[in-house]
Design a protein with these regions (language model features):
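Glycine/small-residue-rich hydrophobic helix-like segments
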Residues: 174, 178-232
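Long, contiguous interaction/recruitment modules in multidomain scaffold/adaptor proteins
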Residues: 1-13, 20, 47, 54, ...
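C-terminal non-catalytic interaction modules
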Residues: 1-23, 207-266
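Amphipathic alpha-helical segments of tetratricopeptide repeats
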Residues: 14-15, 45, 49-59, 92-103, ...
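Tandem amphipathic alpha-helical repeat scaffolds
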Residues: 3, 25-41, 66-84, 110-126, ...
Length: 266
């Protein structure tokens, strides 16, 4: 496993674009995660295609785990651009791939990624009770050391609470995510947690939420996290009416040029 790729995907250097050539299924998956965080969706999907080819047949638990992770990662790319119903197909496949495997940290991590993904997919199509049930199942599987899955559980919990208009509950989950991400070493997870807290704060003090979101936006731009920069920009512009530089429309265009096709509102 490449330390550099790990640092870009889940560490302190998410802005790095000169990545080493992957040599293993794990490093190909990490490369996809790193590229997706930068909004380089076409390249990220190509990396996931390699994971799919190398895990075809899914003979060992290791292969099935990374086949599952690849499917849930592909789902996250779809979801980030608004394609929740399609993402649910990938997340469902991700969960099915590891179904029946003996519990282990890696199997539980993959299952939790699929479950939180399915919950977020349910949110996107307005099925909030289903989302909460899926998160409850995920919570039962999260074990010691699964920091990333613990943060994702808080993220989607905050998002479901926001969708139901419960800003107090949303802020509680967002605060939990901020606390968990503070020591994890992943800039991307910390920035997204901060952004969710800003979103939850809009129910209490919209001006302060927009001000804090600007700091988050600046971090996103500094570290090349374009999808999160776009989300930050949308929040700022929606709450304050003042555009960011670059604005959400420009970021939308850049992400589209990198292979991210946003779903048009129906």
């Amino acid at each position: 496993m490449s330390t550099t790729v790990q640092s870009v995907a889940f560490g302190a250097e998410p802005q790095l674009v000169l990545l080493p050539v992957p040599a293993s299924v794990e490093s190909w998956w990490l490369t996809a995660v790193a590229l997706g965080g930068q909004g380089r969706y076409a390249q990220a999907r190509a990396a996931l295609d390699v994971v799919d080819r190398r895990t075809a047949g899914q003979v060992t638990d290791h292969e099935r785990t990374f086949a599952s992770l690849a499917a849930s990662t592909r789902a996250s790319f779809r979801r980030q651009t608004g394609w929740h119903a399609q993402a649910a197909l990938d997340d469902g496949r991700a969960l099915a791939i590891v179904a029946g495997l003996d519990p282990s940290p890696s199997v539980d991590a993959a299952a939790c990624d699929a479950l939180t993904g399915l919950a977020a997919d349910a949110l996107g199509v307005g099925r909030l009770p289903l989302g909460w049930r899926l998160l409850a199942e995920c919570g039962e599987r999260i074990g010691e050391g699964l920091w990333r899955q613990s943060i994702r559980l808080e993220w989607v919990s905050a998002e479901l609470a926001l969708a139901s208009g419960d800003f107090t509950r949303a802020l509680r989950h967002a605060d939990n995510a901020v606390e968990l991400s503070g020591d994890c070493g992943s800039v991307r997870h910390k920035v997204k947690s901060d952004l969710l807290r800003c979103a939850a704060m809009t129910g209490f003090d919209a001006n302060e939420a927009a001000q804090r979101a600007r700091a988050v936006f600046d971090q996103c731009m500094e570290f090349g996290l374009l999808p999160l920069a776009w989300a930050s920009s949308m929040l700022i512009e929606g709450v304050s009416g003042v555009a960011t530089t670059p604005n959400s429309s420009v970021l939308d265009t850049v992400i589209a040029l990198r292979g991210g096709v946003f779903r048009s509102p129906s």
